Each structure stands twice: as C-alpha cells, then as structure tokens.
Amino acid sequence: MDETVNIQMSKEGQYEINSSSIIKEEEFVDEQYSGENVTKAITTERKVEDDAAKETESSPQERREVKRKLKQRHIGMIALGGTIGTGLIIGIGPPLAHAGPVGALISYLFMGTVIYSVTQSLGEMVTFIPVTSSFSVFAQRFLSPALGATNGYMYWLSWCFTFALELSVLGKVIQYWTEAVPLAAWIVIFWCLLTSMNMFPVKYYGEFEFCIASIKVIALLGFIIFSFCVVCGAGQSDGPIGFRYWRNPGAWGPGIISSDKNEGRFLGWVSSLINAAFTYQGTELVGITAGEAANPRKALPRAIKKVVVRILVFYILSLFFIGLLVPYNDPKLDSDGIFVSSSPFMISIENSGTKVLPDIFNAVVLITILSAGNSNVYIGSRVLYSLSKNSLAPRFLSNVTRGGVPYFSVLSTSVFGFLAFLEVSAGSGKAFNWLLNITGVAGFFAWLLISFSHIRFMQAIRKRGISRDDLPYKAQMMPFLAYYASFFIALIVLIQGFTAFAPTFQPIDFVAAYISIFLFLAIWLSFQVWFKCRLLWKLQDIDIDSDRRQIEELVWIEPECKTRWQRVWDVLS
C-alpha cells in the first residue's frame, strides 16, 4: 500500500493534504477486508493523517505565521482603546489654550470628518484582504513596492519612538504622587514589564486590552457624567457654571504669533487643527490586528462602523464639557511642572474642588499610558513582522513562537524604548522632540497612503469587473471621501511646521518640523532605486488575490452572547 502524503503549501502558509493513500486504503477495505481487518485499515488511515498533521505543524512555514486568536470583542476594544489615549487626555490642552473652546471644538469636528474618511477607506480594504499591518501591505500591492516599504518602515519607527515617549511619561505620572524613585529607574522597570507582556500569545494581549479599554471607557463616561453635574451646579457655591467661561474670557482663544486679533485667532485655529490631527492618531489600529483576527469579515466592519460614535462621544463630548469647565486662559494649561497637571481633564477635576478624584484620575492616566505602551510594542512588532513576511526586512524577524508571537520583532521594537533616557539626560530635549515629530508626521503619511491605496483599490476591482456592492464592507461616499482625506492630510503635512516661519524664520524649528518629510523621501528614493520599479503599478498588475482566497475558504462559528453582561459588553465594544 502506498502511504505517502503530499503536502502543498498555499500563499498564506496554510496546507492542503492530498492523501492518496487514504483513498487506496478505503478501496482496499471494500474489496478485501471485513470485521477486524476493517478496524486495522481505519487505524492505518488515521495514522497516516496524524503523521501528515505532525509534518504540517512542524514545517518551517508554520513557524512564520501569527495566530488568529483575537475575538470580536477584542478587536472592538482595541479599536476603542486606540482612540482613548494620551493624545486625548493630554493633547487637547494646547488647542483649548490657543483657539478657545469653540475654536477647538470646530477643529476636532473637522478632523473627525477626515479620520472618518480614512477609516472608511481602510475598512473596505481590510475586510476584503485581512492581513497583518494591512495598510503597509496595501501600499505595496496597490501603489508600489517602494511606497509600501517606506510606509511600513516610517510607521514602525513612529511606534518605536512613541514607545520611548510612553516610557518617559509613565515615570512622570508616578511623580504626581512621589519623586522618591528616579525617572530612569521607572523607565527600566516599565520597559521590562511591557516587553515581557508582549512575549505572551496574542489572545492574552487581547484580554489585557479588553480589560484596560473597559476601564478607560467607564472612566471617560464617568467624567462626562461628573462634568454634566458640575456644569449644572453640583458642589458649586456660586451656582451653575453653564457657559460662564464662554462669555469670560470668551469662546475664542487669543490666537498665536500675529498681533492682529483676527489673524492671530485664525493661526491659533490652524495650530489647534494640527494638534487635533496628532490627537486622533491611533484610530487606524484596527488595520494592524486584521491578520490575527478570528472571523475578520465580521469583527472588523463592526469596529469600523462605530468610529463615528467614538469620535462624537469620547472626543467631541469630552472636549465640549472641558470647554465649559476650563477657561482657555487657565495658567495650568501651559504648566511646565508635573506632566499630568497640564491635562485639561485634571484641571477641570481640581477646579471642581473634589479632593479624591484627582488621585483616581491620575491612576486612570497611568493605566491608559501603560496600555498605550503595551500597544506600541504590539503594533511595531506586527508592522516589522509584516515587512519581513513580504521580503522587505530580514527573514528571521518573521519567526514566531508556538503561540504565534514574532519574538525577534518584539525585541527589535522594544529596544528603541531606551531612547527614553534622552528625556532624562541634560541637553537632550531637542533630539527627543525631533523623534516625537517623526512619530506624529509618520502617522499622517500612513493616513495619506491608506487613502491613496483605496483609490487605486477601487480602480483595480472595477477593472476586474468586481462590484463594490459585493464586497464584505462597502465604504460610504466613495471615492469622494478618499480624495477629501488625501487633500487635507497632505495639506496638514505641509503646513504643520508653519510656526517655524513666523514671526521670523527659525532654522532649528524648521528642521524639527519637517525632518520626517525628508526622512520619508530619503527612504522612498532608496527603495525606488533598490526595486527599480514603476512609480505606480499598472492597474492590471495590482494583486487583489493574495491572502484573500484563503480567508474565503475559512468558516468561523461565533458563540452567542448568553448572559446580560455579555450582551452589554458586546454593544459597548
């Protein structure tokens, strides 16, 4: 009897087992055996299948595949947690100080429409081809290999540098309570903690982020309820606050740079618009998790559809109440003291006179930044893993543990955390600020290339004769929103360093503001020469099949929400 088993590897690293021996065994049973001999033949068949399975599990390709262990509730909360971060808690201070409560509110609403457009573009592509670090892969497939590699490396570097920022900030948050332990010690402690956490299988990361995001959601909803009560007069000896601070000092901020009132206010609003764009970064993180999502074509659209709710509730509503509780001329907004003291959330709580809440809120900030640091390593490692899988980085970076963790990519990402010591060293502040600028603008490039990729994606499927109505998720108002987002993101990238030109030109500030653009161009030109490729793929050469057909063959069975609490969390996530 022939007991050989042929194993064919697909593009996804999945395996198809052609067991010709099994067919021959069954035929042999029918013709020659009965009774005990049937049992013997079936045992032989199972042994062949088991040997094939073992060979499949131990294959080299299997050691390069992450696991689809993130459930729908994990995806929802990771997307939500990416929205509620340090950018929201700390980053809304400068817009409030420069543009005032109304100006800041308008800038966040406007940027909300831009990020909504980006997530719509991402949602349509990532549900069609759900792969790890999807938008760097999409840029490679729909635009060009050079742009895909550049986008991937810029995005990876941005999260590496952000990880260094979070490590330095964690120590500053603890200094709100005590300065007994030096900042450098906290950097080492949290680096070890966050790096080791990312060595566990992704399902544990999903559970951790689910719990942390739940705490952040409850805390933010609690703050909104608390703010509403204070605005209505709870605990206030001089009556309801209402719109008091919109009348005095006013609804519009003092502006910046120009002595002319209207011109200064406009520049202040432009500045707040750029700050809002930085603050919204992280809403695209659902695209990173696509390659590890179970049932991605159900989980990912659901997370994408709720972006509007998250923007309106957690950004706009929070900013609205903060604008009622904190005047734009509050000196704490420009505080150079303890990091968390300049948070408008903390200022509004302290101004209310509640003694216990500042400590509680500081604990929430600590948990939030810890979650952000954990996500920084996760995101960076998956981007680097994806680059390796697509032959854009050394092959060993895509090796994974039995649990599907790309451990070399995790270590290569987390090692950048030691740049946090630049914040501790005297005279290194300028260099650290340059790194932070690379972080912010690299996120803008990712948004820009998501929109460009979606435009090319729509053109490619139309050329193939595929209707967008047949896609797992159809983005709204396309292609208008893709062009809309592309235009304003490109504009923000160009004007985000405008303060370097006024009132006089500052060369150092100019380099700090635009170093990321120079870096992007340098990396792109290097890869363009390396690949010797076209600036853009021809439409007929765009690959929309790789990684897609394997997903279409898989079937996931989602457990139903049986208890009341499960249904509540299902709605929230």
Curated annotation (Swiss-Prot):
GO cellular component: endoplasmic reticulum; membrane
GO molecular function: amino acid transmembrane transporter activity; basic amino acid transmembrane transporter activity
UniProt KW Transport keyword: yes
Secretion signal, residue range per the UniProt entry: none
UniProt-annotated location(s): Membrane
Keyword Transmembrane helix on entry: yes
Residue stretches of biased makeup (Basic and acidic residues): 43-65
Major location category of this protein: membrane
Extracellular compartment segments: 94-95, 175-179, 231-265, 328-359, 425-431, 499-510
TM region positions: 74-93, 96-116, 154-174, 180-200, 210-230, 266-286, 307-327, 360-380, 404-424, 432-452, 478-498, 511-531
InterPro entries found in the cross-reference section: AA-permease/SLC12A_dom, Amino_acid_permease_CS, Amino_acid_permease_fungi, APC_YAT
Record keywords, A-Z: Amino-acid transport, Membrane, Transmembrane, Transmembrane helix, Transport
PROSITE patterns according to UniProt: AMINO_ACID_PERMEASE_1
Residue ranges annotated as Cytoplasmic topological domain: 1-73, 117-153, 201-209, 287-306, 381-403, 453-477, 532-573
Membrane topology field: Multi-pass membrane protein
Top-level taxon in the UniProt lineage: Eukaryota
Any GO BP: amino acid transmembrane transport
Protein function: High-affinity permease for basic amino acids.
Record family assignment: Belongs to the amino acid-polyamine-organocation (APC) superfamily. YAT (TC 2.A.3.10) family.
Protein name: Basic amino-acid permease
